[in-house]
Amino acid sequence: MSYYIPPKVWSAEESNQGKFSAINRPTAGSRFDQKLPQGDKPLQVYSLGTPNGLKVAVMLEELRELGVKEADYDLFKISIMDGDQFGSDFVAINPNSKIPSLLDKSNREAIRVFESGSILLYLADKFNHLIPVDWAQRTEVLNWLFWQMGAAPFVGGGFGHFFSYAPEKLEYPINRFTMETKRQLDLLNKELANKPYIAGEDYTIADIAIWSWYGRLAQDALYEGAYKFLALGTYQHLLDWTERIAQRPAVKRALEVDYKAIK
């Protein structure tokens, strides 16, 4: 393993940051002027087919499946590898420069919504679907929604980065984040042993959020070689839940949605 001695004061280096070295910087804010297109639909979504972007596509397609016409949307592609997330219009919607982001034009004044979990909750509350009314049941859904938001970075930014994207394979970080990823998989597998969905009997935004990461991981759709490496075939309850959700018509459509170009 390479041995690293931290400097007294850290500074960014252009080299050796791996796949995302060309876009990562230690500063926030827009980097260039770029006007985003807007369609005629009530909801404008700026996103990409990553796990976090998939959450919103699934949610909107589920609302369409339920016949919610007010949830019609225009979907635009933000290419994170090209740095579209740092354009001025996008940063005005999401100052954190991450996808997905939503602009709701159905109100007197447009409302911006960013962070995938916030978008799921916003849409669920706005249209009164996929979240329980009962206070205790709603709280359980939110428990799992926020669990996903806090847990998944260990999978994506931790395991996924060092297993798939880092410029060199390092034993310590791969082992560290594999341990945590498998702990999370075991947690989900145990929770799903005696109920069809993560918060109980009903499919909710918590399932959408978790499936977009852990279901896709269980389908071997995120990181090449991860299914075997993580022994995902041993988490049978998680696999059953993954397949149950994968068969939903809205989920199938969400995986095939067309992202319009922004330029």
From Swiss-Prot:
TM annotation in the entry = none
**What Pfam families does the entry give?**
GST_C_2 (PF13410), GST_N (PF02798)
Q: Which residues form the GST C-terminal domain?
A: 134-263
Q: What else is known?
A: Part of the SMU_1296-SMU_1298 operon.
Write down the Gene3D superfamilies for this protein, in alphabetical order.
1.20.1050.10, Glutaredoxin
Fetch the PROSITE patterns from UniProt.
Answer: GST_CTER, GST_NTER
Q: What is this protein called?
A: Uncharacterized GST-like protein SMU_1296
What InterPro entries has UniProt attached to this entry?
Glutathione-S-Trfase_C-like, Glutathione-S-Trfase_C_sf, Glutathione_S-Trfase, Glutathione_S-Trfase_N, Thioredoxin-like_sf
The GST N-terminal domain covers 44-131
- The superkingdom listed in its UniProt entry is Bacteria
Which SUPFAM superfamilies did the record assign?
Answer: GST C-terminal domain-like, Thioredoxin-like
Q: How does it assemble?
A: Homodimer.
Keyword entries, A-Z: Transferase
The source organism is Streptococcus mutans serotype c (strain ATCC 700610 / UA159)
GO MF terms held by the record:
transferase activity
The UniProt record lists the EC number as: 2.-.-.-
Family assignment from sequence similarity: Belongs to the GST superfamily.
